[in-house]
């Protein structure tokens, strides 16, 4: 236990080589917070008696009630290593005291935006996997996100006590189950890893995988056991580590190692991992759980475990907890693994800099980030806002990448839309004070050097959710985070009492600040719309809104899903539109964009900010576009980064560049609100074929061009077999065999389609994967639990947009019904306007 003072932490912050910033990531309910507890307990913040129950990082009341983590929280831990261990660290270190900034992040799929925010400020990740359930859909999503941010993973296989007590497996089965889990993690890592990182796969024999039980508070790595045995037998530790995993066997008769399963006489040999690592654990479990009073003291003496007075009276599970905690304390194994195998900021920023920074890789800011230099200009990324204890104020939570941040320092606050050299989205203000985040508490601190995680007070009015703070005039922004989920479920919110309206508006502002993945907007009919990533996410957001941010009673409409409008074919004739003064004409056609191009745009692979030549090269090589077309992409829409494109295919038009801005503005408007029912367009490419313009500049201003281009876009769109797309969830359901029938019946009722069904080897559980339209997903969890007697656990994550095959313009079809309902709700005319309304005759 360490009694911390802020000064001690501050002095550690200066030795950046000894800092580790890491997050804990996992599938929901695989035990992140419980494991985090055993670490926190060592750092001396919660008392030993409460660990395992305290779930220290779940700071919110609803987290403690629901037993899930919703927001990610940060804590600093302190650890000292012995000199032998420090020698094994492959990077530069200074002394043997280490500061670990740990962020516990939610595992529930609806909150993966929180995970993204946590990942941005860390360099390493502790991936927690359940022994029994193995790698699940969310483990994969989060691992993929972290590898895209160039974050190095280490793995903990948790809940080993379940395998021993509930499933009563044999040693060999347990080994096989471990090795399968490690293999499936490595498959994901090798699929998504970045070459820059080198080999980041995890290997038990190198000590990058730990095994343990968060609830009982014990864990071990192969390295720890190798340590014990190398002292006992006088062998080299490195050699011992290699032998304690994989196909290596020890023959006790000949005292020799072999890699064959049988000895010379054909008798089976026991695998070294089972014999040296699992055997003592299995024996302890057997002796204690079967109440063998005489064996216990003998075993404890052999393993050098000393029980105190009243601990000798315990029996059964309580004794097991105490003994295992003394034999293999979880914190030792995890801290050792974190310190040995995760990179320090100095190491990590070297290869992460170009991915974090938007500007050129040779400007002073980027070089300072690369070197993690505390003396250069400040570069700080704010990844999220954390609500303070007094209503309505937020701490900005972020990481210093270069320079030193001080209380009272004047900084440039750059929002996500800031462009160097321009004034918009830029404030120059002083930071009131800096604070250390410690789970439920904060400690004020004077300054904080590069490589550390910090909270700032007094800049929450100037930033919406994320942004860059800097003191360097020419600095570009740090790159914006890519979220793996998109807000697709929306509700309309009204106040019950009209006098409360200003409070609601204020509350919505705060809500959108506190959650990185909520969209708050206002519809034309004056409704306030809140969009989230799924049912649970929305429920929590609205609960926050009602209780904290606005503090007033609300009326909430049933949830509605966001659709997209798209086209299937090319326009059947050229769409022509004339300007209001009849002096300008625009001719264009619409056509669909391939799904993979749309995905590449949404995933940021094809980026509107990239150099147009480089972008054209990618589109030509990978997606088969014509190079001249790819170079002449005028813009992406909506919002300047969506999956719709304007391509200029005109030949020798006079004054064309003067109207480019107006055309782009009109396209943004048209794609944000399509003609069918006012939803965004997706995968629509508009080719401008010809433009006739008036010779005088005054007759071709924005007021003439913008409405014309919008009408032409609509006409071209409606001529090109318009369709609508609905969002689809990928559902992963884990259940025992007898519950499968119930799952299928619920899925069939909800237009779901099953993609795969497989049994997890060595367990009675089946995993069913299916696609479920989000529109049908409301109340799905409840119905599923009813149909299966509460045995099935669904995990839903947004997967893709699926085009509805039927014609949205015909009210008798499925798509037409959706369109009609949406138009009624928004107070539009009931029938969709025909293309003739937007088309002008010559």
Curated annotation (Swiss-Prot):
Catalysis: reaction(s): GTP + H2O = GDP + phosphate + H(+)
Enzyme type, top EC level: hydrolase
Span of domain tr-type G: 17-253
GO MF assignments: GTP binding; GTPase activity; ribosome binding; translation elongation factor activity
Subcellular location: Cytoplasm
CDD domains in UniProt: aeEF2_snRNP_like_IV (cd01681), eEF2_snRNP_like_C (cd04096), EF2 (cd01885), EF2_snRNP_III (cd16261), EF2_snRNP_like_II (cd03700)
Modified residues annotated as Diphthamide in this record: 699
SMART domains per the UniProt record, alphabetical: EFG_C, EFG_IV
Keyword annotations from UniProtKB, A to Z: Cytoplasm, Elongation factor, GTP-binding, Hydrolase, Nucleotide-binding, Protein biosynthesis
Binding site for GTP: 26-33, 158-161, 213-215
Main location: cytoplasm
GO cellular component term, pick one: cytosol
Function recorded in the entry: Catalyzes the GTP-dependent ribosomal translocation step during translation elongation. During this step, the ribosome changes from the pre-translocational (PRE) to the post-translocational (POST) state as the newly formed A-site-bound peptidyl-tRNA and P-site-bound deacylated tRNA move to the P and E sites, respectively. Catalyzes the coordinated movement of the two tRNA molecules, the mRNA and conformational changes in the ribosome.
NCBIfam families: small_GTP
Protein family membership: Belongs to the TRAFAC class translation factor GTPase superfamily. Classic translation factor GTPase family. EF-G/EF-2 subfamily.
Descriptive protein name: Elongation factor 2
Protein source organism: Kluyveromyces lactis (strain ATCC 8585 / CBS 2359 / DSM 70799 / NBRC 1267 / NRRL Y-1140 / WM37)
């Amino acid at each position: 236990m360490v009694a911390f003072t802020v000064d001690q932490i501050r002095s550690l912050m200066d030795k950046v080589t000894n800092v580790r910033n890491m997050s804990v990531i996992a599938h929901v309910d695989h035990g992140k917070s419980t494991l985090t507890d055993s670490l926190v307990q060592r750092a001396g913040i919660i008392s030993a008696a409460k660990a395992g129950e305290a779930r220290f990082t779940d700071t919110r009341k609803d987290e403690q009630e629901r037993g899930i983590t919703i927001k990610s929280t940060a804590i600093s831990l302190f650890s000292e290593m012995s000199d032998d261990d420090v020698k094994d660290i492959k990077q530069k270190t200074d002394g043997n005291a280490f500061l670990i900034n740990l962020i516990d992040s939610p595992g529930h799929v609806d909150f993966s935006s929180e995970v993204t925010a946590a990942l941005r400020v860390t360099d390493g990740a502790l991936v927690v996997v359940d022994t029994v359930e193995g790698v699940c859909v969310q483990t994969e999503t989060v691992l993929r996100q972290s590898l895209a941010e160039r974050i190095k993973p280490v793995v903990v296989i948790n809940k080993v006590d379940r395998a021993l007590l509930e499933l009563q497996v044999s040693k060999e089965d347990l080994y096989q189950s471990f090795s399968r889990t490690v293999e499936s993690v490595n498959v994901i890592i090798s699929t998504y890893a970045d070459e820059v990182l080198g080999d980041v796969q995890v290997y038990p024999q190198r000590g990058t995988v730990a095994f343990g039980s968060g609830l009982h508070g014990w864990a071990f790595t192969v390295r720890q056991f190798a340590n014990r045995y190398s002292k006992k037998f006088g062998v080299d530790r490195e050699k011992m580590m290699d032998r304690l995993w994989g196909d290596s066997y020890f023959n006790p008769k000949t005292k020799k190692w072999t890699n064959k399963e049988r000895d010379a006489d054909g008798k089976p040999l026991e695998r070294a991992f089972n014999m040296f690592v699992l055997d003592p654990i299995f024996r302890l479990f057997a002796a204690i759980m079967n109440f063998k009073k005489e064996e216990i003291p003998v075993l404890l003496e052999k393993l050098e475990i000393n029980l105190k007075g009243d601990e000798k009276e315990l029996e059964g599970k309580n004794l097991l907890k105490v003994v295992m905690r003394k034999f293999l304390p979880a914190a030792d194994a995890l801290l050792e693994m974190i310190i040995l195998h995760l990179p320090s900021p100095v190491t990590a920023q070297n290869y992460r800099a170009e991915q974090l920074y938007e500007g050129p890789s040779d400007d002073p800011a980027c070089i300072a980030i690369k070197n993690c230099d505390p003396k250069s200009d400040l570069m700080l990324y704010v990844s999220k806002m954390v609500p303070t204890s007094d209503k309505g104020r937020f701490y900005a939570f972020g990481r210093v990448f270069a320079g030193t941040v001080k209380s009272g320092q004047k900084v440039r606050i750059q929002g996500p839309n800031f462009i160097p050299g321009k004034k918009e989205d830029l404030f120059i203000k002083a930071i009131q004070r800096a604070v250390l985040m410690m789970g439920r508490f904060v400690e004020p601190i004077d300054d904080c050097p590069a490589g550390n995680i910090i909270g700032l007070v007094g800049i929450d009015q100037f930033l919406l959710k994320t942004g860059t703070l800097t003191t360097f005039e020419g600095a570009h922004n740090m790159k914006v985070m890519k979220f793996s989920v998109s807000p697709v479920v929306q509700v309309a919110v009204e106040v019950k009492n009209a006098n409360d309206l200003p409070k609601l508006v204020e509350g919505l502002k705060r809500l959108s600040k506190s959650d990185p993945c909520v969209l708050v907007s206002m519809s034309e009919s004056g409704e306030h719309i809140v969009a989230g990533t799924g049912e649970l996410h929305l429920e929590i957001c609205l609960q926050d809104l009602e209780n904290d941010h606005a503090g007033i009673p609300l009326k909430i409409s049933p949830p509605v899903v966001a659709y997209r409008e798209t086209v299937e074919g090319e326009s059947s004739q050229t769409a022509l539109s004339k300007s209001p003064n009849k002096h300008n004409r625009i001719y264009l056609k619409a056509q669909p964009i391939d799904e993979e191009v749309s995905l590449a745009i949404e995933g940021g692979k094809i980026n509107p900010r990239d150099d147009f030549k480089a972008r054209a090269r990618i589109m030509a090589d990978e997606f088969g576009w014509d190079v001249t077309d790819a170079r002449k992409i005028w813009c992406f829409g909506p919002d300047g980064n969506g999956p719709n494109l304007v391509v200029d295919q005109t030949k020798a038009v006079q004054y064309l560049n003067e109207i480019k801005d107006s055309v782009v503005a009109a396209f943004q408007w048209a794609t944000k609100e399509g003609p069918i029912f006012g939803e965004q367009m997706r995968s629509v490419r508009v080719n401008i074929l010809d433009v006739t313009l008036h010779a005088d500049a005054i007759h071709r201003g924005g007021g003439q061009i913008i409405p014309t281009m919008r009408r032409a876009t609509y006409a071209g769109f409606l001529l090109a077999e318009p369709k609508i797309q609905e969002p689809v969830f990928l559902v992963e359901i884990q259940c025992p065999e007898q519950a499968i029938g119930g799952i299928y019946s619920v899925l069939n009722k909800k237009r779901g389609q099953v993609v795969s069904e497989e049994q997890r080897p060595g367990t009675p559980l089946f995993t069913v994967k299916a696609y479920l339209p989000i529109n049908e997903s409301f109340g799905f969890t409840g119905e599923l639990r009813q149909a299966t007697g509460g045995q099935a656990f669904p995990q839903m994550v947004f997967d893709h947009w699926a085009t509805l095959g039927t014609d949205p313009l015909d009210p008798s079809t499925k798509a037409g019904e959706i369109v009609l309902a949406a138009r009624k709700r928004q107070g539009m005319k009931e029938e969709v306007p025909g293309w003739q309304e937007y088309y002008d005759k010559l």
